[in-house]
Amino acid sequence: MAFRHLAVARLKSLLVLCAVLLLVHAMIYKIPSLYENLTIGSSTLIADVDAMEAVLGNTASTSDDLLDTWNSTFSPISEVNQTSFMEDIRPILFPDNQTLQFCNQTPPHLVGPIRVFLDEPDFKTLEKIYPDTHAGGHGMPKDCVARHRVAIIVPYRDREAHLRIMLHNLHSLLAKQQLDYAIFIVEQVANQTFNRGKLMNVGYDVASRLYPWQCFIFHDVDLLPEDDRNLYTCPIQPRHMSVAIDKFNYKLPYSAIFGGISALTKDHLKKINGFSNDFWGWGGEDDDLATRTSMAGLKVSRYPTQIARYKMIKHSTEATNPVNKCRYKIMGQTKRRWTRDGLSNLKYKLVNLELKPLYTRAVVDLLEKDCRRELRRDFPTCF
């Protein structure tokens, strides 16, 4: 009889151990999608559908959780920097409290329209406002396991006031949405023509080496969200987030626009080969992105205009970001060149990587002279 009780006890212990191992395996290799069983019938959401239902129905995480290794011209980021991020994830993937649950499918504290902060607190003040943010601008919920791991990629140069305003607004929003996130500021070195698309590719490459992100949101520094229901999460299809901007009277300037803020999974970025590296100066890279998205068999999705709303910070034209006079010639060749222009041929030099309290700062040399020399082969009259 005693032997029988002992056998039953051992069997129960074995079953509990198996359950724990299955849970850990699931959390590492396939954290459940927010709404992986939901689908949408159209790539563009219709305005007369209930706004929040439309958001939820178009939210999913379909990419795997494993880090990818892209070929680049710089060595893998040091173990010290990787460890700084990975230490944060250990208690999430292997919690001491095995009863820790995933966060609610709908974040519980969303209110809809929110205050947009236009003041410019200094960095020390911002650190006091957001004390729970980890090194590198890495935030995550404390009382539940985040359902999404999101890297915010911001191309940047010489706009510190805008950066502080954006950080103030984004950290407030992203914490409320219960995301596991970090903000990456990808800063181009001085004395080069600004290249937004290539900075996006570099941001993706650097961020992917630090942490197993599922979703990448490419975000202009001068756009501030006006509604907290605009979820910064992984889309089923690539998503144009900045649908309604005050500068354009909250209307799309044209139907094919894919600029401002875009959200793509790792799988999407692989399929479209990232952004073009060849648009030096203002204009062209966002329309090129729309074309390569279509060529890869994907569609651009949007949330309803009453949710996907943004305020744009006013700014003057920058001397280092002149209008790209060759943009139309390059865009005319996108269908021919997109598979060999992007992540697949990305070349840059990582000058500095710094985990600041509110963001990760990556300073990069985009090797403009070398790239322009190569471009002359395809566009001899432009470069």
Swiss-Prot record:
GO terms for molecular function: acetylgalactosaminyltransferase activity; metal ion binding; N-acetyl-beta-glucosaminyl-derivative 4-beta-N-acetylgalactosaminyltransferase activity. It is an enzyme of class 2 (transferase). Its cofactor is Mn(2+). One of its GO terms (cellular component) is membrane. Glycans are attached at N37, N71, N81, N97, N191. Disulfide bonds join C103-C144, C215-C234. Mn(2+) binds at D222, H315. Residues 1-6 are cytoplasmic. InterPro entries: Galactosyl_T, Galactosyl_T_C, Galactosyl_T_N, Nucleotide-diphossugar_trans. Disruption phenotype: Worms exhibit resistance to the Cry5B toxin produced by Bacillus thuringiensis. This is thought to be due to mutants having reduced population of glycolipids which are targeted by the Cry5B protein. Catalyzes the transfer of galactose onto proteins or lipids. Required for susceptibility to pore-forming crystal toxins in conjunction with bre-1, bre-2, bre-3 and bre-5. This is Beta-1,4-N-acetylgalactosaminyltransferase bre-4. It comes from Caenorhabditis elegans.
